[in-house]
């Protein structure tokens, strides 16, 4: 088994009209901001414009659609993950961290990184548009996933799954991303 065996890729998980709707709504939203990383703003590591939508009242309908797609695909991922890794996606109560839309213009990027932070254990990405030249997600194994509207990727957010968002050459790239983390018991 190699690390690519735990990278789940499935097409057509969001309707293309919904993807276009999210892009157009994102472009008009005044709450967009310069994308940061776990330790803050670092333009040598990431250049994107971001918007966390899950706490926005006017994004509730879209948030629900993302949640339904994630719930369905997380269930498929749990069944799909081979031994001995399956216990890591079955044995811990989980929750998503919400949904963040990112816009990466030609020349923008997200350099090599992993998503291990706190209790995160899985990363998910939906591509909201097709990108024809570069703009792919690349893993340190050499696997490259080309953006297609509605395509979803789920993978462990741990350090062996180092990945990057390669700069699109001439098209603006839109994704929606987030993480599944171990559920935090608020009573503790």
What are these regions (language model features)?
Residues 1-92:
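Non-heme Fe(II)/2-oxoglutarate
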Residues 67, 72-188:
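Catalytic core of non-heme Fe(II) oxygenases with the double-stranded beta-helix
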